[in-house]
Amino acid sequence: QIVYLARLHGFSKADATAEATAILEQLGLGERLGDNVETLSLGNQQRAQIAAALVHDPQVLILDEPFSGLDPIAVDVVAGVLQERAARGAAVIFSSHQLDVVERLCDDLVIIAGGTIRAAGPRERLRDEHSTRRYELISSGDAGWLRTEPGVEMINFDGGYALFDVDEEATAQRVLRRAVAEGDVASFAPQHPTLAQIFKEVIQ
């Protein structure tokens, strides 16, 4: 079936067979080359459908929920194939509710809810736009002093670990200076929201 689809796009029989074999092996279906789609598991059927979309080496690839029904290993395999195609210059567009995968793969994002675009743009710009003044501190000393620090709202605290919000950036710099004075600081960094957190924010 995959060979037939390649033939429809002008491949010779030999080239179609070679291309179909290569993409199926790349997607982890090398041992199932002669099987009918109906005999495959749902996850393998999904991978076979992706192979059908890729076999003619399209320059624009539009996929609807390509990771649906896949186990974590298969997700990584398919993600790697899509990244490889994008690196070769193909435009890869896909919809997905698996936001951790979307965040890992995509350079540009569009969040749609109720038929309306709620947010769109480069991934890092969206993260910056929806960032709060939240910081994480990891130090050798006890970070309990943060609970009484002006302009600081403690979110989580455990010994030398603290997650907290500040009212302004100047407060964050003041906190860092005191943290250094209190003991060795292993890490002090702003916390950017995940795509899942941005999604929840923009659809509310």
Q: What would you call each of these model-derived segments?
A:
Residues 3, 7, 14-32:
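Conserved ABC ATPase "signature" region
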Residues 36-40:
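Conserved ABC ATPase signature
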Residues 50:
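Hydrophobic anchor residue at the start of the ABC signature
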Residues 61-65:
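Catalytic Walker B motif of ABC-type/P-loop ATPase nucleotide-binding domains
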Residues 79-166:
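ABC transporter nucleotide-binding domain
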Residues 167-204:
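C-terminal coupling/interaction segments
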